[in-house]
């Protein structure tokens, strides 16, 4: 596991944007003749990835990267919100990313939170991921309690896509988007920790002092289902990109180690 420490959230977003650009461009550069498999990426919502999406949009407009052969799978969606609801993750992704890049609509995959059969929706989502040969890169964020996607504390670290009841802490944290805590849905469909761990590469963005304890638990303590993001310690190719504020709880030795190790590293 790598830890990349940047000065602020803008620098962290820029770094991750460059990684994504390199991974996508390298994939198509090295793809064998006759192989039509697209690049498959998992995507999050929330405030943390916004600088990343903004930068990728700029790169796309400048023709530094194309999404025409990229397939996306979003991490989660609220149960009960229509796709055109302004607080749904469908709406968020189209408003902040998909409407501004050259991606094909049929290559966009987001869980349907209004389906009558949640179990079947989740089963089909897993099957569709596998039909593409798995996810090449999963981009994610981290909650203040160390959750990844909507895999709340106590979630199985081998879990697959399913319906989850949200914790009070998550509901409170997400109420800033709804302006009223009573409007925040109490359930969501989410990819599982196991689904994320199956990706060939995982990148987490962690910014802000509020994430400091979660980052400490994820990096310096053992793998623990009460801090689901800690599972990435077991992944063979994972990167956490954070800002200085998020390192507040790390030991000085840990901080210096990663700063030294990554000082001369590339993407």
Swiss-Prot record:
Disulfide bonds: none annotated. It is an enzyme of class 3 (hydrolase). One of its GO terms (molecular function) is identical protein binding. It comes from Dictyostelium discoideum (Social amoeba). The active site is at 76 (proton acceptor), 145 (for ring-opening step), 147 (proton acceptor), 152 (for ring-opening step). Keywords: Carbohydrate metabolism, Cytoplasm, Hydrolase. GO terms for cellular component: cytoplasm. Catalyzes the reversible conversion of alpha-D-glucosamine 6-phosphate (GlcN-6P) into beta-D-fructose 6-phosphate (Fru-6P) and ammonium ion, a regulatory reaction step in de novo uridine diphosphate-N-acetyl-alpha-D-glucosamine (UDP-GlcNAc) biosynthesis via hexosamine pathway. It comes from the Eukaryota. The keyword Manganese does not apply. Its EC number is 3.5.99.6. It is found in: Cytoplasm. Its main location: cytoplasm. This is Glucosamine-6-phosphate deaminase. Pathway: Nucleotide-sugar biosynthesis; UDP-N-acetyl-alpha-D-glucosamine biosynthesis; alpha-D-glucosamine 6-phosphate from D-fructose 6-phosphate: step 1/1. Homohexamer. The lineage of its organism: Eukaryota, Amoebozoa, Evosea, Eumycetozoa, Dictyostelia. Belongs to the glucosamine/galactosamine-6-phosphate isomerase family. It catalyses: alpha-D-glucosamine 6-phosphate + H2O = beta-D-fructose 6-phosphate + NH4(+). Pfam families: Glucosamine_iso. The keyword Cytoplasm applies. GO terms for biological process: carbohydrate metabolic process; generation of precursor metabolites and energy; glucosamine catabolic process; N-acetylglucosamine catabolic process; N-acetylneuraminate catabolic process.
